[in-house]
């Protein structure tokens, strides 16, 4: 019986010539055309046992592929050009991809030009980017490869601070490519992380590129009323889905988002004032009732800062209160601050540089009802008076933008809405052009380059150009609307001394 002789790494395999003749694959057809009878055909880059497995496949149309031998069989099948075995091997590898081997498979797919495996391994890296940073192969990714991964719209990061930590870990292994830091969008980062990067001697250039990472974009939480029950829904920019988080039967409450949880504060249930504060985790949808506030109240003003929820003023039955208190996220004790100079409800409160500003609202007793224009600032553990608003307003919505305050007023006694800018450093109010008039609830959020206003429609106000955009949107029955970025970055005053500890804490929190 005639045989064809193959030499692999010095080992000899004799193959029945009939198997070679019957083979439909190009490699063996070329052997039929050019093989000289007494010469051994030398095969380079192929494993001896993998070649035996291919010969078994040609004889019996069966092959034993496992996670342990798949790579060597796939390499042999590519070199010998046996497409059915290539497909079987690729399917096996894709089926077994996980966060611990996806970078290795990614590199393997590039080396041998396997598109399906490349796409599957890239998808695994994108979905598990924080986990794969622990792989020793992570630091060997090229600058262009990591840029492609982190620029993908579906990369699984929920805050730009996480992106920053991924880059810092890679830069530690690739110090000559520090300019990759410029893929960051500083406006989506916390001040703490920006300060840390600056202390490392790195400079992030102002980016004009569009934001591609959906996960760092603003989440949305909306509460809509229907038949006395309000439904809470959450929109994730990464999944692009709305999900129902739960329901609440409160009225006249306030709400705010802190550490990816929605807090629902005070208000009334069945026409009775309540002390309680409920919290729902927007990711797990789990509810928790946190410690009661110091008193029964509705129509409070709330703001958040440094992991704390602040509740200011409100209406205790028919009397406005000056109580100010805060609850640190994850704790169970309310801490009292000094009372407001003027008790009020329905005013606005906002943080600027760790100081609280409270403005407008209503002061009421059993005998009095006074619409306010005064402004108070809590700084150095006391309330002080600031320049009053140009007019008296019972309802005020306010946000901080670029170190100043922008306030929009509601309509009750007034005949129109007003837009003001409070210049903090000058203690000065100026009136700006107001694009619309709306009777009813409004919701105001600071969103990077613009301020979002939800009223009878969706409005975007751009402070730097003093211009407006209008978008049609159904706002019927909306009781609460907020946009937020997920923020779990450890808060601290970052200095050269505390920098290593801060970065270590961030790595433990974000990348492990």
UniProtKB/Swiss-Prot annotation:
* Record keywords, A-Z: Kelch repeat, Repeat
- Keyword 4Fe-4S in the entry? The reply is no
The BTB domain is annotated at: 2-67
Q: Name one Pfam family in it.
A: BACK
Q: Which SUPFAM superfamilies match?
A: Kelch motif, POZ domain
Kelch repeat residues: 216-261, 262-307, 309-354, 356-403, 405-449, 452-498
Name the source's superkingdom: Viruses
Ranges for the BACK domain? Answer: 102-176
Q: Which family is annotated?
A: Belongs to the poxviruses Kelch family.
The protein's name: Kelch repeat protein C2
Gene source species: Cowpox virus (strain GRI-90 / Grishak)
Q: What is the lineage of its organism?
A: Viruses, Varidnaviria, Bamfordvirae, Nucleocytoviricota, Pokkesviricetes
């Amino acid at each position: 019986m005639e045989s064809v002789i193959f030499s692999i790494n010095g080992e000899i395999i004799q193959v029945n010539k009939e198997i070679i003749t019957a083979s439909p694959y190009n490699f063996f057809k070329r052997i039929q055309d050019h093989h000289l009878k007494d010469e051994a055909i030398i095969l380079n880059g192929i494993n001896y046992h993998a070649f035996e497995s291919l010969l078994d496949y040609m004889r019996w149309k069966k092959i034993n592929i496992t996670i342990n031998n798949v790579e060597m069989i796939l390499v042999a099948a590519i070199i010998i050009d046996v497409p059915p075995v290539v497909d079987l091997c690729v399917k096996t590898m894709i089926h077994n991809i996980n966060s611990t081997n996806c970078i290795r498979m990614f590199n393997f797919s590039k080396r041998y030009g396997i598109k399906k495996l490349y796409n599957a391994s890239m998808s695994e890296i994108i979905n598990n980017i924080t986990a794969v940073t622990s792989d020793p192969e992570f630091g060997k990714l090229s600058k262009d490869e990591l840029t492609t991964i982190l620029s993908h719209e579906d990369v699984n990061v929920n805050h730009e601070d996480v992106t920053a930590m991924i880059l810092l870990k890679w830069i530690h292994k690739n110090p000559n490519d520090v300019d990759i830091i410029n893929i960051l969008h500083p406006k989506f980062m916390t001040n703490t992380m920006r300060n840390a990067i600056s202390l490392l001697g790195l400079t992030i250039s102002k980016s004009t590129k569009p934001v591609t990472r959906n996960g760092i974009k603003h989440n949305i939480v909306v509460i809509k009323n229907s038949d006395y029950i309000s439904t809470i829904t959450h929109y994730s920019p990464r999944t692009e889905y709305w999900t129902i988080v739960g329901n609440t039967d409160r009225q006249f409450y306030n709400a705010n988002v802190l550490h990816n949880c929605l807090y629902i504060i005070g208000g009334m249930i069945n026409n009775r004032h309540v002390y309680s504060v409920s919290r729902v985790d927007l990711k797990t949808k789990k509810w928790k009732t946190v410690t009661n506030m110091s008193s029964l109240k509705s129509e409070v003003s709330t703001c958040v800062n440094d992991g704390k929820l602040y509740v200011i003023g409100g209406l205790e039955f028919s009397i406005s209160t000056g109580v100010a208190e805060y609850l640190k996220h994850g704790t169970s004790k309310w801490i009292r601050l000094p009372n407001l100079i003027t008790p009020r409800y329905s005013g606005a409160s906002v943080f600027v540089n760790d100081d609280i500003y409270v403005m407008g609202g209503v002061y009421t007793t059993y005998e009095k009802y006074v619409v306010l224009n005064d402004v108070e600032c809590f700084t150095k553990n006391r309330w002080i008076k600031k320049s009053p608003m140009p007019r008296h307003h019972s309802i005020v919505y306010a946000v901080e933008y670029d170190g100043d305050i922008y306030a929009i007023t509601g309509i009750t006694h007034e005949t129109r809405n007003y837009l003001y800018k409070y210049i903090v450093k000058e203690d000065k109010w100026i009136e700006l052009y107001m694009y619309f008039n709306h009777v009813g609830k409004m919701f105001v959020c600071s969103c990077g380059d613009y301020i979002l206003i939800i009223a009878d429609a969706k409005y975007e106000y751009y402070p730097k150009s003093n211009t407006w955009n209008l978008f049609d949107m159904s706002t019927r029955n909306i009781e609460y609307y907020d946009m937020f970025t997920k923020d779990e970055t450890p808060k601290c005053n970052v200095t050269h001394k505390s920098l290593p500890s801060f970065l270590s804490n961030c790595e433990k929190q974000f990348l492990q």
